[in-house]
Amino acid sequence: MKVKELVSGLKKLTGCYPVVLMNGEETLGLSRDFHNDGSDWAQLSLVVRKPMNLDTEFLKVVLDYCARQEHHSLFSDETPFEEFEVFASQKESEDAFYTIKILKCGMERVNDVEVFALHVEEIFDTDKVND
């Protein structure tokens, strides 16, 4: 599945276009198509703390997660972390499993625009660390 197909799917799911961010700045070339000045982002924010290859498999897992949720009820600091494993290949290194934590997600208003925001954190699987 291509990234643009995932974007289209999320648009149908949430009623707004996502902007894909990596480390708060990398947009994978998508954001320029979906916002004017950056203030009214309807965004799917993939916030990762360690460099990784954001491939379509990772995005597919995130989108599948979104599709199963009640978005409006999840945007809360009291929401417990949701964790799942995702397989991500890294450039010039071994393939690795990552644990993805959903920090929070849901519909919110930004500058009078209804947006869907999803914040995730990736953590390298501790099973890979030597005892």
Where in this protein do the model-derived segments appear?
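Detector for the mature cores of small, proteolytically processed
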Residues: G15-D131
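DNA replication sliding-clamp ring fold and its partner-interaction surfaces
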Residues: M1-G15, L59
